[in-house]
From Swiss-Prot:
Transmembrane segments: 33-53, 67-87, 98-118, 124-144, 170-190, 204-224, 259-279, 303-323, 331-351, 469-489
KW Membrane (keyword) present: yes
Motif (Dileucine internalization motif): 12-13
Domain of life: Eukaryota
Residue spans, topological domain Cytoplasmic: 1-32, 88-97, 145-169, 225-258, 324-330, 490-504
Gene source species: Danio rerio
Any Pfam family matching the protein: MFS_1
Protein name: Major facilitator superfamily domain-containing protein 8
GO molecular function term, any single one: chloride channel activity
Compartments, as annotated in UniProt: Lysosome membrane
Amino acid sequence: MPLEESGENTPLLRGEIISDGDTDRSRWRSIRVMYFTMFLSSVGFTIVITSIWPYLKKIDESADASFLGWVVAAYSLGQMVASPFFGLWSNHRPRREPLVCSIFINVSANIYYSYVYLPPSHNQIHMLLARTFVGIGAGNVAVVRSYVAGATSLKERTSAMANMSACQALGFILGPALQAVLSFIGETGVSVDVIKLQVNMYTAPALLAACFGVINILLVILVLREHSVDDHGNRIRPINYTPEERVDVPPEVEGDIDHIAVFTSNVLFFIILFIFAVFETISTPLSMDMFAWTRKEAVLYNGIILAAIGFESILVFLVVKVVSARVGDRPLLLGGLILIFVGFFMLLPWGNQYPKIQWTDINNNTIPPIQLAPTPASNSSLEPIGCPSEQTWCLFTPVIHLAQYITSDILIGVGYPTCNVMSYTLYSKILGPKPQGVYMGWLTASGSGARTLGPVFVSHFYTILGPRWAFSAICGIVLAAIVMLSAMYKRLVAFSIRHGRIAE
């Protein structure tokens, strides 16, 4: 198919050389399917994140916050293992194959999660396995990012990546929001005896995520087509094209990839995902300890808070698309890291007020929490609330106030989405027109490794030493990321700019 110039109007910019109108419409339909796939991946993680802790306690009373860290990390561990594999697969075969396979795994794993209460023993292990398989299914994020990077020109890419991040944020919003709505089903819910399924506030979100997955499989099969363009917008043959897709093949792209910049980008992405995984994991236990919320209150209120952060993120992505065109990607990345640092600094405990303590007697039975002032009788509950006395730091660590918590949420809600979209947008530009499947697999694995280590780190650190030490350590990590970005600032440039093909 000969290359020809488009008209003035393109989906995101004007005056670029692309293929004919039908092919271009097909290209953007396929990119939108990738947006939905990213949305599904985000929903698969967040739709249960606020209810994992109370669900875990319901199926196994002996589970502690340390095991919660492993359950949350299991998703990311599965994604970390699967991402390079799916990325390699997508470099050599049509992307439909790894996408359909991964989404099917995701659907099956969410159904498995809905049944983890059923076995007579080892329920917490079943939950761990279910979340691991959900994570393996989410390994297709590498395929999604490499597809969007390869199907957009250099000028289109920041906007396309911001759109993809907005879809990810929408999943981030709808996940906790749906969990908050479904919390009204209650812990008992409805029993479907024929298939031995309990539909309640813990299982309904996972079942809904499975339904989204079925829709996604149909879209991938019926709508997705392989498309690829170079940095200037010229259509090229994808490395994994099928014979019926006849396109002109340009000369081999000359120039090497800056592997130091690639390594730096992976480290920065790891840190960005690590610190947000810490924030996601600790929100429910922290709020239950500091604000004496019940399990149901923690699920509802944190669901609302995380949904609000998601809406904030979408606004951030809209602003980022405009601002990045004026100031560039790197200044936005640096600014986002500074906001995250301030957000975690706000979470450090100050003052001389202390949280309500949840005491236990010598038989390990819970005693109602200490009340420092008279409270209405309606506040008391059979469910133990407050900061557990077995966490010794509860006795001497000042309380974190709700205003601190909300302010921190707002700051991190601006800083994280900015860093997220800028980091992998920069990464895709550094790689240039080379096949990106494997490289995106490593980037996704890097982020998944962060999501694996982050929850384990914070659950142990928080349980043993408390929020003061946990959040001080996070502030130190963010500061190290700021220093690294500043030191490598000049190397983090697009492939075509580095080789002088496009002016910066």
